[in-house]
Amino acid sequence: MKTTSPPAKSALLKALIAFAIAAGIIAFLFYYTGTRRGPSPAERETFFKQSVTPILVNNTFANTKALEALDTNIHTQFEQYRGRVPNFTADITGFGNKAKITWEAVRQLASGDQKKVERHVTEKFEMNVVSAKRMQEDMETLLKGFCRDIEANRNRMLVDIEAAVKENSQMSPRSIKLQDVFAEEINGKISQLAKNSGHDVALMTSLNLLASLAADYAVTTLVKAALVRTGASLLTIIAASGGTAATLTAGGGTVGLAEGPAGFVIGLAAGCIVGYIVDSVMSDRLEKKLNSECTDFLTKAETSLTKDKDGLIQSLDRALVEMQRIQSPVINHQLEVLP
């Protein structure tokens, strides 16, 4: 009986191994390019409703909580400002200060010089309560914290969607990286929406912030814009109140203009304070009244900043609604182009 030589056996074994490898590769390619198909429109729609929509709902809820936290933090910050008012009123109503302010205010009304006395009061206010620079920095710090929360929520949403796609055998033969494409596409749409927001400057500024997320320039721009609107709102309220405070406040706002929008708000406070002192200089309850009026002014400033339609919180709320509206089709588009 004829036997196969060892070299022949080795060659045959190698041929069989090569054949098996080739067959495996062919089967693999056949499966993924032939019998393996991408999800149908119906399958994709079902997946989106059952797996993606709950994730988007959770993201909306998390963003709402982040905005509520920002609102609470702003309130807490203004509570700190209000807590410092008694020190300021005790300082400003001391005999020397009260006499100086009253005398300078009378001269101001007669001469039209509306700066000197407000500067004195502004210095006292900034020393005891809050400076224009510190107020702006405080608001920017809080807003940056909000941006970090929104960014964390966005990243969590994308990771959860990626995991859902990976776990669903009908969706894709490979995992996807939404974060690689989402930021560019969603930010492009947000920026475009901001350009098309027309005269809604508050919404446009808020959308630009959400598109850049915590970029220092965007944060500063939004805070300054919000403080400008706050100052304008306060000026309207004060002017409607009448009295010496209203007369002097018109000039008081100009004292802080060099320090930006927060300086404008502090300048308005100074004008009000001078007016209250002049109107009540002979009253033995001046300090108590001034304490009440200063606290009320800060409360109105907080309300304007957070509750007005174009205030910081309300404009961010509208921007979040718009962002949530456009991110759904962006994600759906990424699912449509899955292999």
Regions found by a protein language model. Give the residues of each.
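An N-terminally focused, membrane-permeabilizing/fusogenic/translocator signature enriched
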Residues: F19-Q136
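Pore-lining and gate-forming transmembrane alpha-helices of multi-pass membrane transport proteins
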Residues: D200, M204, N208, S212, ...
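N-terminal Sec-pathway targeting helices
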Residues: S5-A22
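Amphipathic, membrane-inserting segments
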Residues: F19-A22, I26-L29, T60, T64-K65, ...
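Extended, amphipathic alpha-helical coiled-coil scaffold segments used for oligomerization/tethering
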Residues: P86-N196
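Membrane-engaging insertion elements
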Residues: E43-V57, V117-E126, V130, V223-G243, ...
